[in-house]
Amino acid sequence: MWREFEPETDGTEYLFLDEIQTVRDWQTWLKLQVDFEKKRRIAVTGSATPLVTEGQESGVGRWHTLRLSTLSFYEYLHLKKIPVPSLPDLRSLAELFDWSPAQFATVSADGASMVAHFHEYLLRGSFPESALIESITAAQKLLREDIVDKVLKRDMTALFGVRHVLEMEQVFLYLCLHGGGLLDMQALCRDLELKKPTVNNFINLLESTHLIYKLSPFGYGKEILRARYKVYLADPAIAPSVLLKGTTLLEDPTALGVAVETAFFKHVFARYYALSVGFSYWRGKRDREVDIVAEVQDLVIPFEVKYRAQNTGLGDVKGLAEFCETRKASRGYIITKDIQGFSILSLPFDITTKSGTVPARIAKVPAPLACYWLGKTELDSLDG
């Protein structure tokens, strides 16, 4: 039909098709286009798993599938044309362990202006449409009605055949209330009066449509037997938008901490997704925890988010210290609120590895700076 509006011309033709997964047999049509229309270059987008799963067989050797993340904090600042202080370029957060105290002090002073913009990023969300709307109330309304509702009510029925949409919405609302924490499946089933297989199916579908991330516990065998999953929403602004919190999120230390943890996980996941990094959480025998653990081959990297007003010291991260000692991790990270507390902490033990013995240390990184650098290095890695 589009040919009726666009007459054929010489040279390369470019086709851009959105929400392709809603078209029946889209992969067959795309295969024919690639095989027989050599002068066409086609880009298709979709927001659901069928774009990947249904196109794998037909697409081998014909097209590449790329995962596009929502806006990082770095991209958000540039999209809104917000002046950014001159910060050092980092290829990895690991480079912070080579900094001098003077470098930390300088960047702390320069980065202070980013805190308010980071808080607004948490309220608006990481979608371009909501980022560009002037009113935060309108941005959250858009996120709630135009993005979340469409996925729940349109994609779930059209693509996955979900018939009990109301029950699905109740499960999602429950996750908005309890996001960033361990999922108590028994409590969820009891409170919503739903059966466990139904809830498991809903949660898997929510993960398939990229509305949530699900983390399994760190470890193997008996360590994770019957352990609970940890659930993050896909965007820090989803929960305050759905729960109609508005800007009061910033006045609720607990909810704000969850939003920051959600934002940080989104950034670290997007940064290392292409490298097939495994993500989990850790919980020790004395209820000591590590929020996020990244596994890269034989290397484990723990992250703990402590977004609170008071200064965070070694006494506040006993779980992180225990994990580093027992799992032989020489480096860990605390993601904090205190922009002036940007520094390196030394743990009271050394770590022995194949390459020798090294001191165990933790980098205290303010959340706005951590998300800024992760977002920037994600783009830098795509540029090669």
What residue ranges belong to the model's regions?
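Short regulatory helix/loop adjacent to the ATP-binding pocket of P-loop NTPases
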Residues: 50-66, 77-82
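Interdomain hinge/linker elements that couple catalytic modules in large macromolecular machines
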Residues: 83-266, 280-284
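A cross-kingdom feature that marks ATP-driven nucleic-acid transaction machinery
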Residues: 204, 211-384
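Short glycine-rich substrate-engagement loop in P-loop NTPases that contacts/grips substrate
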Residues: 1-11
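Structural recognition of the conserved hydrophobic beta-strand(s) that form the central parallel beta-sheet
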Residues: 16, 41-47, 67
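Conserved P-loop NTPase "ATPase switch" module shared by AAA+ and STAND
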Residues: 9-26
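Conserved Walker B catalytic segment
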Residues: 21-43
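Catalytic P-loop NTPase motifs of RecA-like helicase/translocase cores
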Residues: 20-24, 51-52, 130
